[in-house]
Amino acid sequence: MCLRRKLANAIRALSIDAVQEAQSGHPGMPMGMADIAEVLWREFFKHNPKNPLWNNRDRFILSNGHGSMLLYSILHLTGYKLSIDDLKKFRQLGSNTPGHPEIGSTPGVEMTTGPLGQGLGAAVGMAIAERTLASTFNKPNYDIVDHYTWVFVGDGCLMEGISHEVCSLAGTFGLGKLIVFYDSNGISIDGKVEEWFTDDTENRFKAYNWHVVSNVDGHDYRSISSAIKDAILVKNKPSLIICKTIIGYGSPNKSGLETSHGAPLGENEVLLTKQKLGWTYPPFVIPQDVYDHWNFNLQGVILENEWNKKFQGYYNKYPDLANEYLRRISKNVPDKFVDNFNKFIKELYLCPKNIATRVASQNVLEFLGKSLPELIGGSADLAPSNLTMWSKSKSIKQDISGNYVHYGVREFGMTAISNGIAHYGGFIPYVATFLAFMDYARSAVRMSALMKTQNIFIYSHDSIGLGEDGPTHQPIEQLSALRFIPNVNVWRPCDQLETAIAWKNAIERKDGPTALILSRQILCQIDRSQEQINDIYRGGYIVNTTVRSPKVIIVATGSEVKIALDVSNILFKKGILVRVVSMPSTNVFDQQDNDYKEFIFPRCLVHRVAIEAGISDFWYKYVGLTGCIIGIDTFGESGSSDQLFSKFGFNSDIISEKIISYLKSS
């Protein structure tokens, strides 16, 4: 057996042993891609196992994340803090080797992957981030940002629609440092893909403006190495390397079959496979000579030390740029940023305006853009509607050091790309579309929350208030759907002041995404005290604090807060005292201490009403099963905003009568 094959077989052996030990997992892909991984990681991949977060490391994304044991095996072999005992605990509760790669669980894992295609989208984001950051900070002889993004994908990734969205955009942007390996083994869970996947992948990607290296023997290290060298030479296009492989390579009875995809080989087949591969070692045993050839600790330290030396020279020559680079990579805001943001909010308080919250958001962006150069925005072909561009927005297509991405109509791809930009570092991304189209992107929003990504999602045209475009564009259930995703802070502000504070919360939050739900129609600014402004940060607060001993609480969000205040005035004239609560963020409110929640919603105040132009079921947690909810549980219609609010009962007189009836009946 040649040395190169022996090194690849170490990946195969560890993968089949771990899957067999766990009695679950996916051995076929690691067995099929082991030779590709050996060539990439030993000949080309730039990293430092001693410091997995070295800034100028290459990025590796396993988009076909079910083959996680391939990555875990490589990380163990190259010297990361991942032991044999960790591999033996593969897929076990509490281990750092979960079934699919999870960022934060395993050193060396750059991105949580599993839902096919999303890793590819994130990789496009990382390649965008690398190029944009490089164009901002690099100077002659000082390429402090200079590395590749490498991706493994399978048939499933390329069948997913997101692959079209993100690869089309990557080709348009000419991301020359993005190199993707396609594991073309012709097998998926259901069998041979020729029955459902007959795309001409080579010409598909050429049409995207990609460089394609086809017909690479995925089990011949010379062919693989030659293909990578070919791809590296192409600077103005991303590259796809199509590797012909055999799933379950080495298994006498399961290679080339779907039976090797997602289940242990079985004890007998493991023995037969190792015999065929010439692997004579017990389970989880790697000979020292294999470790010696795989270990990358020394080379990694040398690479990082060389970069540190270069960065020191850069720092000496360009100290301001170097400090700005370090600030951005460290995720620290600029000096005086918080003070300036607070001054900006105070100005909004002193100079009230009746404007749509999407306009208010754009005004905040005008302030943020001048204060936070790390802010990088984009919209799914709705910039004039979402209002996501500010006066100094620059398209990265026209200027690679720009700060704005025209994503085109690619909501899902846009969000996955934004996840990659966020995890790359040095940027705070925001992306936008209509709230009704959030459903296209929802899976990537969920991944953002799972990965604790600082990502900002702008969803405008937040209700039937968008008007004449009709029910296809009018969100009903989307707002609640977002709130139900764990770790997403959802804000639906009622005016420009709440909008600014929602943005401030999003910028300050480092452990998860924030969704800003914004109106198309003009909303009135509400009068508040400084104490009330402070309480906006708590997600929910009392708007009409002068009311003492109320009989009923009305809680509302967004455009319905003004309606709630009008209702309270009508009921006051009828002798009914009402407390109005604005709850711009139910998620943030739920995180408050029990005393504050009791202060807002005293248990003794059992008469409660919720008003929101969306699905009603969500609000029972606040008003109780006997509460009154004014919501919308059908789809909308085409008409003006005023007509629709009236038709669906969002009228202060109608709601007042409903509340009176509710109080009488209870």
Swiss-Prot record:
Keyword Metal-binding: yes
Biological processes annotated in GO: pentose-phosphate shunt
GO-annotated cellular components: cytosol
Binding-site list for Mg(2+): D155, N185, I187
Sites where the protein binds thiamine diphosphate: H66, G114, P115, L116, G156, N185, H261, F437
GO molecular function: metal ion binding; transketolase activity
SUPFAM superfamilies reported in the protein's UniProt record: Thiamin diphosphate-binding fold (THDP-binding) (SSF52518), TK C-terminal domain-like (SSF52922)
Catalytic activity, as annotated: D-sedoheptulose 7-phosphate + D-glyceraldehyde 3-phosphate = aldehydo-D-ribose 5-phosphate + D-xylulose 5-phosphate
Keywords: Calcium, Magnesium, Metal-binding, Thiamine pyrophosphate, Transferase
Cofactors demanded by this protein: Mg(2+); Ca(2+); Mn(2+); Co(2+)
Swiss-Prot/TrEMBL site (Important for catalytic activity) positions: H26, H261
Active site: E411
Cofactor annotation remark: Binds 1 Mg(2+) ion per subunit. Can also utilize other divalent metal cations, such as Ca(2+), Mn(2+) and Co(2+).
Cited Pfam families: Transket_pyr (PF02779), Transketolase_C_1 (PF22613), Transketolase_N (PF00456)
Coiled-coil blocks: none
Subunit record text: Homodimer.
Family of this protein: Belongs to the transketolase family.
NCBIfam families xrefs: tktlase_bact
Function: Catalyzes the transfer of a two-carbon ketol group from a ketose donor to an aldose acceptor, via a covalent intermediate with the cofactor thiamine pyrophosphate.
Name of this chain's protein: Transketolase
